[in-house]
């Protein structure tokens, strides 16, 4: 990180001076919009001494995707909303997701089943001739390839994403519970 040199003839604001004096030994972390606004207002004046500058591009690269999307205050929802609000948000989004999933699932099942039925009908009437020996041979090849490629180790990408999901669920138990309950209700309606 680079440091800025002081400008001559300037006096720092008292609140900013206290804040910056307490942060000189440790890296600069901003936890709320109020602190950020206070720092921005204080930086309009000039400071004496050396301060670290914050490279936002580097900070953004290190943040998880949900922090980039929702901002710094996107921690556990338990800190921001009441229990009823969390359950309501989770339940409504879960119900909507379950309802849409049910409708799309029915449509997809109908399309696949109808296509299979039409293929069977075309085969039965003689429009299509299926070489069942070739199909069986190809299926055996596919089974062998799957046995060869099969491994008991989970890829690291899958493992890291699973850990992110588990962490999110642990931090937002009420929203997650409401979502799954709403999802089941949406699937049933």
Curated annotation (Swiss-Prot):
GO biological process terms, semicolon-separated: autophagy of mitochondrion; intracellular triglyceride homeostasis; regulation of platelet activation
Bilayer topology: Multi-pass membrane protein
Residues carrying Phosphoserine: 10, 53, 151
Disulfide bond residue pairs: none
Superkingdom of the organism of origin: Eukaryota
GO cellular component entries: mitochondrial outer membrane; nucleus
Keyword Transcription regulation: yes
Gene Ontology MF, one: phosphatidylinositol-3,4,5-trisphosphate binding
Keywords: Membrane, Mitochondrion, Mitochondrion outer membrane, Nucleus, Phosphoprotein, Transcription, Transcription regulation, Transmembrane, Transmembrane helix
Subcellular location: Mitochondrion outer membrane; Nucleus
PANTHER family to which the protein is assigned, alphabetical: FUN14 DOMAIN CONTAINING, FUN14 DOMAIN-CONTAINING PROTEIN 2
Function: Binds directly and specifically 1,2-Diacyl-sn-glycero-3-phospho-(1'-myo-inositol-3',4',5'-bisphosphate) (PIP3) leading to the recruitment of PIP3 to mitochondria and may play a role in the regulation of the platelet activation via AKT/GSK3B/cGMP signaling pathways. May act as transcription factor that regulates SREBP1 (isoform SREBP-1C) expression in order to modulate triglyceride (TG) homeostasis in hepatocytes.
Family under the similarity heading: Belongs to the FUN14 family.
Name of this protein: FUN14 domain-containing protein 2
Taxonomic source organism: Sus scrofa (Pig)
């Amino acid at each position: 990180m680079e440091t800025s040199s002081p400008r001559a003839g300037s006096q720092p604001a008292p609140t900013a001076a206290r804040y910056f004096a307490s942060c000189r030994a440790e890296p600069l972390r901003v936890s709320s919009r109020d602190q950020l606004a206070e720092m921005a207002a204080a930086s309009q004046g000039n400071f004496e001494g050396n301060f670290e500058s914050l490279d936002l591009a580097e900070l953004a690269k290190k943040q998880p995707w949900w922090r980039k999307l929702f901002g710094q205050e996107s921690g556990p929802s338990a800190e921001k909303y009441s229990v009823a609000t969390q359950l309501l948000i989770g339940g409504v989004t879960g119900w909507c997701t379950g309802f849409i999933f049910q409708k799309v699932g029915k449509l997809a099942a109908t399309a696949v089943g109808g296509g299979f039925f039409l293929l069977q009908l075309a085969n039965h009437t003689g429009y299509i001739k299926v070489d069942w020996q070739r199909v069986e041979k190809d299926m055996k090849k596919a089974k062998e390839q799957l046995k060869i490629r099969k491994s008991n180790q989970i890829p690291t990408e899958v493992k890291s994403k699973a850990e992110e999901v588990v962490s999110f669920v642990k931090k937002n138990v009420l929203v997650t519970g409401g979502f799954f309950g709403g999802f089941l209700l949406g699937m049933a309606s």
